[in-house]
UniProtKB/Swiss-Prot annotation:
HAMAP family attached to this UniProt entry: 16SrRNA_methyltr_C
Gene name, Swiss-Prot/TrEMBL: rsmC
Quaternary structure note: Monomer.
Domain of life: Bacteria
Function statement: Specifically methylates the guanine in position 1207 of 16S rRNA in the 30S particle.
Similarity section: Belongs to the methyltransferase superfamily. RsmC family.
Name of this chain's protein: Ribosomal RNA small subunit methyltransferase C
InterPro entries listed in its UniProt record: DNA_methylase_N6_adenine_CS, Mtase_sm_N, rRNA_ssu_MeTfrase_C, RsmC/RlmG, SAM-dependent_MTases_sf, Small_mtfrase_dom
Location relative to the cell: Cytoplasm
Catalytic activity: guanosine(1207) in 16S rRNA + S-adenosyl-L-methionine = N(2)-methylguanosine(1207) in 16S rRNA + S-adenosyl-L-homocysteine + H(+)
Length: 342
């Protein structure tokens, strides 16, 4: 099943006849394989690891799939399809990236949901693209086209990052935020409560859903000898976490993982401010899987400590897999769940 934006792209498949096409920030579907009916070759760059996993197994001589914030080569394409990001601040970066990978005069096709920022895309196009035209309007989405007029500037991550000093219970930290990565530029209430009640940790520790690396850096500030691993599904978050580590002179293993699937071995502790906040059934299912996988990959006596919104049903899930529920701290918004594996 194709997402609405992907369906609109497929409605206009004639744009890609016999062309070498790049998809940037694509959806969690198989649009790339469908485009091969007309396109000569398709390359995909997913910024979401789950979206990459969805298409990766379909790779062949005409389909190349990548995950990350940039392609591993300077290859150029006849056409680039850019899926407008949910975070509007990420759009200028992706437009720059698209420009770097287009041949002179190459076509940029931009698709997005109307409720996003796609309506004003012609005002957002940098001057190395022409003004852009609307090609389609369907499935609650809009599709625009623009041509590359001149060479797009080289991408340097340092141009797309904002750093700031954050005061935490463990001390001051420098946090690096790339565009598109959530930041309040202060310690959010949930993370603050978690850091205020961190246990003494040692050994191999996992920071699940690391984001820009706030918890990561705080853990290493408290104990630089931790064997710390940091996972997320967002390419910009992972790159931000690496920049945060470098800015604080710290080291950890940072990589993409769907839940805990890509992690290996057992951990002495799993610490997290899990990115599941809306309480929807689908989100609750993911959260349940996270608790189950965490219990399975903790050593005996290992620590599982997370912060969560009070209204989320973590208690029953934790009781199911850890046999007991321990709330180490709470306020009117959040709870700290702290359990040890039997």
């Amino acid at each position: 099943m194709l997402s609405n934006p992907s369906q609109v792209v497929l409605r206009n498949i004639e744009l890609f006849e016999s062309k070498n096409v790049l998809l940037i920030n694509h959806e969690c579907d198989l649009l790339a394989t469908a485009l091969l009916e007309d396109a000569a070759k398709v390359t995909t760059l997913a910024l979401d690891f789950n979206h990459f996993q969805r298409i990766k197994s379909h790779e062949n001589a005409r389909l190349q799939c990548h995950f990350g914030h940039q392609l591993p080569s300077t290859q150029t394409f006849d056409a680039v399809v850019l899926f407008y990001p949910k975070s509007k601040s990420l759009a200028p970066y992706l437009l720059n990236l698209a420009g770097r990978h287009l041949i002179p005069g190459g076509e940029l096709v931009i698709v997005g949901e109307k409720k996003g920022g796609i309506r004003s895309i012609t005002k957002q196009l940098p001057d190395y693209f022409d003004g852009g035209i609307k090609l389609d309007n369907a499935r609650h989405c809009m599709l625009y086209s623009s041509s590359l007029l001149s060479e797009a500037p080289e991408i340097k991550l340092s141009d797309w990052v904002k750093d700031y000093v954050l005061s935490t219970p463990q001390g001051e930290l420098t946090i690096c935020n790339l565009v598109g990565v959530f930041s309040e530029k202060r310690l959010d209430e949930g993370t603050e409560l978690l850091l205020e009640h961190l246990p003494t940790l040692k050994g191999r520790v996992l920071d699940f859903g690391c984001g820009a690396g706030v918890i990561t850096a705080a853990l290493l500030k408290a104990n630089p000898d931790l064997e710390l691993e940091c996972v997320d599904i967002n390419a910009m978050a992972l790159a931000s976490c690496e920049l945060t580590l470098a800015a604080n002179g710290m080291q950890a293993k940072v990589y993409a993982s769907d839940g805990l699937t890509q992690t290996q071995g057992m951990f002495d502790a799993i610490i997290s401010n899990p990115p599941f906040h809306d309480g929807l059934d689908s989100t609750t299912e993911i959260a349940t899987r996270f608790v189950q996988e965490s219990e399975a990959q903790l050593k005996s006596g290992g620590i599982f400590q997370i912060v969560a919104n009070r209204h989320l049903p973590y208690s029953d899930t934790i009781a199911k897999f850890f046999k007991t529920v321990n709330v180490a701290a709470e306020n009117n918004k959040y709870k700290i769940y702290a359990n040890r594996k039997a």
